[in-house]
């Protein structure tokens, strides 16, 4: 494969009538999702925009995912703007991104109006019903290669100024294969997705789902304030795999929710993005003794993850979880302040190299150069 879209097309051919993405209002089968993405891609491609950044302003929904894939079909790359983002942050992102167009849902038009955006706006509700032009999409596809950017995720980092890490199709394909192989993601996998689509953890959920022919359920944010209802949804949808930030897992543990209700189908509990407290982890392990638990670690710049640790022993409350070993086809190492490799027990800064790496920060060569090192310094 050289393109993310090939993953979707392969799974849609195998499982056309199976659900791929479900939110609280919409259930989309693989066939429906593929058709919608191609329709949106056609509507964008008609404007002659190619290999440019396109912002997707949408609520967290199956429709947002269709718009993301639609941007890819148009031969461009996307940046997700969540409907709850403050307008000032979006303006700061747009200042760097300078999007060639915006795909926006009706519900998010009010946010778009606050941005003083004068470029092309594509209405999601209209675009999703635009008949797909297979000839146009075919011409676009002919010119796409695996090193083309797929998306840019913006992270503030330590400065508070948004930086857009650009990730290629090749990086996603390499990462998703590792993730799916390692955690045995397949057509029987049913994700319960907690993270926003502008956060790198969602890359694992979304793209491994279409790679393997699985199903992803978008959990409403409000349910984390009503944990018993959250359990009901997870059981009703037969969710068997979750990849959440630790603070979400801690809600269940701190309220001891699993003392009052069970999770009938969960087989894999993965977490990243924050430090997982071992006291709360021990609660989960006690309640789900046969589940796989794994601590994943990595910055946005490594697509999502560069190291992982499958929990294989008991930890005392307060004990630190290791970040584990490097992912396959990804190398991690520690450099000291003088630029030399740290030895066991020495401190330094963690670096990564491999196919998962982002292309750099969009429209920001200074930050890209500052975050990179010469290959000669590590070989």
Model-derived features: positions:
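Carrier-protein-dependent adenylate-forming modules in NRPS/ANL systems
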Residues: 1-170, 183-184, 213
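Conserved S/T- and glycine-rich ATP-binding loop of Class I adenylate-forming
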Residues: 54, 71, 102, 149, ...
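AMP-dependent adenylate-forming
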Residues: 1-5, 87, 102-142, 172, ...
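Short hydrophobic "strand-cap" motifs at the C-terminus of beta-strands
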Residues: 24, 152, 194-195, 219, ...
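Gly/Ser/Thr-rich phosphate-binding loop
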Residues: 212-214, 239-243, 253-322, 331
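Conserved AMP-binding
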Residues: 58-61, 82, 185, 195-202, ...
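Conserved AMP-binding/adenylation subdomain of ANL enzymes
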Residues: 163-192, 200-240
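Short acidic active-site motifs
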Residues: 88-89, 226-229, 279-280
């Amino acid at each position: 494969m050289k393109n993310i879209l090939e993953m979707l097309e392969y799974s849609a051919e195998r499982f056309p009538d199976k659900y791929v993405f479900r939110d609280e209002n919409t259930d989309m089968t693989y066939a429906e999702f593929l058709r919608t993405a191609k329709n949106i891609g056609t509507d964008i491609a008609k404007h002659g925009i190619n290999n440019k950044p396109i912002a997707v302003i949408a609520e967290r929904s199956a429709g947002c995912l269709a718009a993301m894939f639609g941007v890819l079909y148009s031969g461009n790359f996307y940046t997700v703007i969540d409907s709850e983002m403050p307008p000032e942050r979006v303006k700061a992102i747009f200042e760097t991104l300078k999007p060639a167009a915006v795909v926006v849902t009706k519900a998010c038009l009010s946010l778009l109006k606050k941005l003083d955006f004068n470029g092309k706006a594509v209405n999601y509700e209209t675009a999703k019903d635009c008949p797909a032009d297979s000839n146009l999409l075919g011409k676009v596809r002919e010119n796409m290669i695996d090193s083309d950017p797929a998306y840019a995720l913006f992270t503030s980092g330590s400065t508070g100024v948004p930086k857009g890490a650009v990730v290629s199709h090749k990086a996603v394909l390499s990462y998703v294969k590792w993730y799916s192989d390692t955690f045995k993601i397949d057509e029987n996998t049913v994700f319960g997705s907690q993270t926003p689509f502008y956060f790198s953890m969602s890359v694992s959920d979304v793209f491994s789902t279409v790679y393997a022919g699985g199903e992803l359920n978008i959990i409403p944010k409000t349910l984390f304030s009503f944990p018993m209802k959250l359990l009901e949804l997870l059981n009703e949808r037969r969710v068997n795999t979750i990849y959440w930030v630790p603070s979400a897992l801690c809600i269940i543990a701190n309220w001891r929710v699993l003392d009052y209700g069970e999770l009938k189908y969960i087989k894999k509990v993965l977490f990243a993005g924050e430090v997982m407290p071992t006291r709360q982890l021990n609660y989960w392990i006690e309640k789900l003794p046969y589940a796989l638990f794994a601590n994943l670690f990595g910055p946005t710049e490594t697509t999502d993850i560069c190291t992982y640790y499958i929990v294989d022993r008991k930890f005392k409350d307060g004990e630190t979880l290791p970040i584990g070993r490097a992912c396959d086809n990804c190398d991690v190492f520690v450099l000291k302040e003088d630029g030399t490799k740290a030895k066991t027990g020495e401190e330094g800064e963690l670096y990564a190299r491999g196919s998962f790496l982002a292309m750099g920060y969009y429209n920001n060569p200074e930050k890209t150069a500052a975050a990179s090192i010469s290959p000669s310094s590590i070989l």
